Amino acid sequence: ECLVGSEMCIRDSYMMERFLERISLSEYRDKFILKGGMLVAAMVGLDARSTMDLDATVKGANVNVEDIENLISAIVSVPIDDGVKFQLKSISEIMDEAEYPGIRVSMTTTFDGVVTPLKIDISTGDAITPREVRYSFKLMLEDRSIDIWAYNLETVLAEKLETIITRTTTNTRMRDFYDIYILDQLHGNTLNRQTLHDALRATAHKRGTERHLAEAAEVFEEVENSSVMQKLWESYRRKFSYAADLEWNIIMRAVRSLYALSEKESSL
């Protein structure tokens, strides 16, 4: 993850944004659904979340190396007068611990003589509950937005909750914990309880982990009291200024609270 506010972080984010605008103007605009770090950073503000990843799910298209190569080539060929050039470097299947099978696209971007690597992970068949939403993505350097399809908030949170519950103390991605805290802080009042409940169960069903949900309370206890997890969180706090004031118990309280909310099925 890049350090928030650093030149590299801003440049990375800008290049991802340039790719998103090309998607929004391409024939594939209704097939690409944004998720992951770039979406969370957009939701909470770049000063509150670092990102190095652009994750998307694709619907209505095959996710294999050849088809994705054609799709990406078409997107980066969209003519935009922003001085940014994209070059495809490699496309490969994702095999590392992926919740969903997918394709990893590696590109380089060139802007004003500076070359920046850009990585995009593309999956298909994600459980989006109830469905993707139109997201108004604010541009960094211009006073306008682009409309793209994206995960809804409940599905973003459900995926992170499911990961925390099923990976227990083997989940070294502290950003999953931070994201739950910050998204709840900033957008918790907009959450639909029933949708969150349904999204968590749909995600677990898709990943074949439904049996783990019943163990959530024990998992949270184990994770909160784990010295390994506490050390990982302390390291994250030192690295990222936006998390510096957040104690581990505050983070875990947010995780427990979100899970409790998902457990309460609406009576409506």
Where are these regions (language model features)?
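Residue-level preference for beta-strand/loop junctions
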Residues: 2, 50, 99-101
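Short, mixed-charge aromatic SLiMs
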Residues: 39-45, 201-212
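Single conserved hydrophobic/aromatic residue that forms the stacking wall/gate
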Residues: 1-5, 9-10
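Short amphipathic alpha-helical segments enriched in leucine
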Residues: 1, 20-24
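Catalytic cores of NTP-dependent nucleotidyl/adenyl transfer enzymes across multiple folds
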Residues: 7, 17-21, 31, 61, ...
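Active-site nucleotide-donor binding segment shared across nucleotidyl transfer reactions
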Residues: 24-54, 58-60
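Extended interaction regions within the primary functional domain
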Residues: 10, 37, 152
